[in-house]
Amino acid sequence: MSIIDERKAALLARVRDYGGPLNELPVLAQFLAQTMHESGGLRYVREIWGPTKAQRGYEGRADLGNVKPGDGKRYMGRDVIQITGRANYRALTAWVQKTFGAKVDFEAKPELLESPEWLGIGAIWYFLTRKGLIDYARAGNIEMVTRRVNGGLNGYQDRLRWYDDCALKLLGFGTVRDFQKSAGLVVDGISGPKTRAALHEALSHVRETPKTEHEPPVMSKTAPVSDARPGKSPPIKKAAPAKTGSGSAGFLLGGLLVLIGAKIDALTAWASEWAHWAASFFN
């Protein structure tokens, strides 16, 4: 398995096990779009260290909690949305321990944030604890989600492209044209505000999982039902509260099974349908 495939599987597992509202399809599309941009498509899960002038400035920064010699480099940015500084590693540790009962200490072992066992947890923490971020994601407000993640609109066009790709694949469509035709939009292959609004609306109404990339899911005006399932992340005392539709849970489980090459004899029809489709999600 390639390092990228390993990271794909790890990120999917973290979202399933710890993501809570991130498992709602409209929110999941926003989350994946931001993490894919921030990590360069999962190529970078640790800050590239020079050190640059800015990185040398990490040393001794009280606002980052870097109070000991070497803290600047030791607590460099890690994860698919980078967590930087001793204070943030400590805060993340406290949140994971309190929320999930997990025995982990990112302050003591900062490299865990880039490990397969914990990759993605920092990004999940960021999304779940930043005021208004989940609400903006639920509303399909890509601009405000970007501002909350980035502080501005750096790389905004690339984030939009990632959103298009993630939303289309979550919905089971191969191209923008395919979706536009199905949604009754002008078929020009260009994803603009109207197409993205329609993508968000469709994600909000998914009630059945697609069987293949060419068989889009059925839309419904009813909310997705709860369908949480156990995971294989590090042991936790309690699962994160989640509101997930069968589409989201199936996507995560099916994607994980395919990506890690798991062989389970008793796969249900529900999971096996997703396994084939989800293999192409990040391609």
Predicted regions located by residue number:
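Long, repeat-rich segments with strong aromatic
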Residues: 111-120, 127-165, 244-251
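Cationic, hydrophobic amphipathic alpha-helical membrane-interacting segments
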Residues: 206-283
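Surface-exposed patches in mature extracellular/periplasmic domains of secreted proteins
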Residues: 19-31, 44-47, 133-146, 187
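Acidic helix/loop microenvironments that form the catalytic cleft of cell-wall polysaccharide enzymes
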Residues: 35-38, 136-155, 176, 181-183, ...
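Peptidoglycan-targeting cell-wall enzymes and recognition modules
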Residues: 1-10, 31-126
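Short acidic, glycine/serine/threonine-rich helix-capping segments at coil-helix boundaries
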Residues: 171-219
